[in-house]
């Protein structure tokens, strides 16, 4: 039958040659269609598609709706294979334009029809589109009179929407049906005329505007009505003039053939001669056609094709039949039968040959494509809702291989040599474990909508099983998922990406059936834990790779090479694990979580090496079944492996004498479980292969030999840096179509989950143009698959977000859109060119060529309304002096205390830049030169390194890069300036540069599209040089020119820009440009020009303001101001009025110079006018150098700003100064001098003084009223070029916090904060040497790559939090400590006892040290100290004031044993401690005794001290004396206090006694070694001899700071922080509390450095095994001293340096926001207390802990109201309470110290005491400070009672009193006599009494006199007052 139809078509085509030049044998039309619901129902039944919702018997025309039926591509392809050339598509006018208007089309319907048309085009069927068939829009029925116009509009819409896909159009398919729809008209003729007019209009529109490439338009007429219709003038004219061919609806009744021929003959009467197309052919009652269809067609054509009338095609539906043999594929063919009955159809199916496979159909469809057709670029967009994203894998990027208890994975063990390039490992990788915020910022910069990442199984379950999940691991993924959600990014979580826990691999891994259960448990935990937020799950990522490379070739872990057995077994278990996991989710989680679970499979595309060889074609298909079908077929088809794969393995095994490959079999139950066990098919694809058939000539198993194929590549395919990836973009389209036809069949969506290519390390690491081309071509092929092939692809996910560890390739292959600097410890990420390109694709959702619509600005910013200015000037000095009165007396602690809170909800967070500093392109695209271009190109400009802004950051060419940064930062606003000379090259509006305008339009549109608010500065110092050539700002014409430029900007950009600033920092423009001449134009006229320039600038600003106000404000609704700059001025002596006035004057001369005229009264500040006027007069000038405004100008200037924009960076200390008069100078006019406090932190340009910001904001409010304020610049310049910029973090942290205080505490109306600057740039005279950027710019790289600094991440965090809210963990906790909690206070013998030589005491090393010059601050000594040796009673009072139950003190070794040995025991000294202990016990205070607190007897030091191993025995003997003599009274012993300090400070750096510093690399370790052994011996002595009888406890007190990493996202810093704590606290704790030996960190570091320095062993001594056993466990509790926290970071010392610090390799700093103390090393960091207590719990197996010291110092303290100490104690003790809540076994707390004392090398300068000791009073009284009362209340309350529960009695206490001072006999002078103090006091009292008596006597006499006088005047008038009484 196929052959007969070929003959028919050849015969019919012969008609097309009869006298026509339009048709040829190639374009004879054979058409099918249209789609009807009935047809779709039948087709869906044929294919077994139960998802289709078509009703049987519904013959209505199909109205397009999404999604298209999945079987259509297959149906259309079969039609094409049957010689069908065209297909009819009926549009639905009513559905496309439901409202009747082309302004509101139904876009979904439009897109649906486009997909349908593209599907036809893909199948090589040409669409024939009918504009209207039936059902008019309701709106047209009410407007009949305009029907023709309405139809014309609709036709125009259709031509525009679909014309690129359609070549043949029909206006109407049934005129009679349309007439029925029209409202009643007078006559049929008028109805026909209406339709004719509508058709004519459409025809004319089409041929005038849309008929490109030979498009045609017609109308369909019924054949039987031809004679009648041709008599109607409208139709006759239509047929002659307005059709390209005539179309007929023909019903051919074979019984009445003659009648039809007669009617058709009328066609010959039409002139000119027409071409005829049989649009619709019906053959009722024609059984003969089944036998001979050709005869029927020939008879029809004979009737038509006469006299040059030509038939160009016909409808072939009557001869078409479609069938299916397997419900998997469809076949359509032309048949002689008119209609097959059901029984006939079944017979037909059984006799049909097997249909072509999906692969064969795709190959046939594409094999003959021309290169031009194959590579044709499709300009279109992806469907709405398409997901764009990037991917990573856990083992590729996370690092943190041992963090948080993570278990070892199979990728973790170091591989054998040469396994990975460069011996790369993944311990750190890209360090994503610490960089969640950074990675999410990258995604935000990309505008990604989905992020595919994998979960590390061993990070969740370290041993692979779910008995004990790792909480830190769970927290990491929770943090990542939460951050993604906050950023609006969909998480796609992969459960398994090749990194099996090693613990499971040790039991066989994926070859052990039990791993399926383990995986299911792991997956179930992930679903339960993360599934509330994760809605896209991937069970396995590329299981083929794991099976092939991990178990087949052994290239990947676990390194098993068994391709015939292991790889198939592993795949088998993976599939079962996947299926069980999917069903578990489906049953247990889907109902609540509504997520989707799929699998990601990888596949190359395969094509035959020799297309003419059928065996190569079959091998190509087999390749796909082996690679993709191995996993896809069981899941997506029938639950089993592909038949091709099974057959091939069976054949292979038959050919060999033994089984080469063993393919496991699924049970029927397993098949049912597998089938359909995926909600989507994830696909990753990178390249294509050419495949040839491989003869079976070997029985050695390999992947290729088992598959029977051989892989090749076409060498013309471009090669990437990876040997296995060639660029073959069209392969992805074909693969997607194959997947759609073979597996998903439109029922399951496809997620493209991996596509990309690597670049090599030797390539340009930032300009990856090859990858850009790769993405461009591959993504476009995906678009073709969706649009032209109707493949249901839902996502495109690029591989990968960042560079990572690439398995065997190590780090040599870079797949990242972002470069990772693996040589930098911060693992900084920098976007590549491909990242920006990918963003552009995402923004356009594909490939748009049309210009984007202009966007409206984001409406998230609440702009203030216009504000009123004052009408009167500020006073001199201004009333703002109250700011100094309020703040200058603040204590430093109060001033600097960090405040927690947030800003207003609509607070505007931004970053800033300026045109000249970043744009570059100085002469590009018609830009004119500016004064800065001229200045930097002029020799001698004094710009460092002769730098210019010619390129700068190249922002003019890197707009995408800048927008990427802004999105990543999450800023709400971007402040930038417009280059006047880029817009107007000559400065005048007659020279508009369209390229410059376009740049700013694109910038503004990009900002608005990213929801970032543009803040635009019109002038940022870069005046067009052409205007400078006419005098610049000294020329009055500049005011008009500036107004013209501004007007243009308002008009051009104002629809999107709502925040304008006229000038940036005009003070610097005036002074630096025209005063000092440092800036261009370089005028040096300091006394006159600055004032003139400022005068002009103020007037120019006012002019522009009024222009905006009058012309644009009402429509654009923006605000306009100018950015003013100043620093804060702090009076050097706040109590000296002249200094306060000088500070105020400085502010008026800088800020008030411009702010006073604008925000107050239109004129300069009086202080300026006064000073400049007076000095001008003193300089003998006729008038003031300060110009004056006219009254009219004042009115014009006043109130010309809507908000106050402030730039501020630093502060100065100011005092009054009388400067020289001549030469005149603006600087001297201020009559003040400035300086900086050297203690302020230094920067590259100025010292930081953040507290000045708060004061400045308050001053502005006082001076200018409660006006909305925006900080438009604030930042810090550093010379450090690296991405680590902790100092910048501190700067922004403290400055923003001061702004927060101003907003929250002072009521300042602060609306926004804009950081300077977005990125490093050209910093004026500093060139590129000073870096202000949150982003680092590499100016040595032509690509100017931008890399986020640590400060960028911090600033994003501030923005996200909208300030600095108190973290939940830092909130104050109300509660009580456990019953029995011990409260104590501490001291130490040498620090308080004094009596250094009393009663036989021997010398200690501290006696010697303090008597040595230059050892102790202020030459202080401890000879007397607090004299506690003589003041037991007074010390008891201090303890009773505190209410403590315990007192920790130390015993002086040299007071008990003067020479350090037991040869002589000093009973007097011993008796002191007996009396002290008895006194304590009598007061119910328990002693806690420290045996050794640093004061070694000097005699022992003389023989080496702690470096001499004999000290161990000496210490044991000394302890024995104490146990024996005091043990019955003392039940709490501490052997050593802070051995770290003894070893490190005493023997390392020599800053403490004994001052040894010449052996820093060995002595500390030897001393530490002996200290540990001495402790152990003392402990064993007590344990063995005394514990049973005395019942006490004994341990050691170890001190340690807590260490936080300086950069928590930097693995090196994290490890440095750990190392800091292990070298400090762990040095001594690890041997005693853990295993008897030093920690591995110390041992490894010191050994490695010792060997590197040439030593043959470690400098750290080793314990013998017996010593380890004796040391281990020598504790009853953990005594712990803690004061502060540090920020630690890695610091590598040269190996030649031998010291403890060099071994530790850590540097430390303090956060500037941490409150200071009196000690340089002690910052108040309460949070660290809780953290280190928890660390002790975890590290040392939860020992009982007693805090044996904690407190804070104040330097030179005299105020008893020690609020800082109260803050310290309150917060630290509260953190201890939280630790108790954390289940830390904390038993007691000891405050350091009970009273001020001798603080070692700082002498008496630092005071830690809760009692003030007055050292200037010989009696040394102990006076309680406020902190003593506070601590006593905590002790009484045993914590912090909740005030919400009411007042608590424990909070009330009697006032504590000072201790009683002894009476001393001294002589004093009294009335010229030398008397004792007692006698002088008595005499004083006597004299005082006599004076008092004398005064009383005089008063009595006066009273008597007055009374008597009054009585003598009783006769006087009552109205007269007595002089005395009135007095």
Curated annotation (Swiss-Prot):
Keywords associated with the record: Cell membrane, Disease variant, Glycoprotein, Glycosidase, Hydrolase, Membrane, Multifunctional enzyme, Signal, Transmembrane, Transmembrane helix, Zymogen
Signal peptide: 1-19
Active site: 1065 (proton donor), 1273 (nucleophile), 1538 (proton donor), 1749 (nucleophile)
Biased composition (Acidic residues): 1226-1238
Propeptide stretch(es), residue numbers: 20-868
Pfam families according to UniProt: Glyco_hydro_1
Protein name as annotated: Lactase/phlorizin hydrolase
Organism: Homo sapiens (Human)
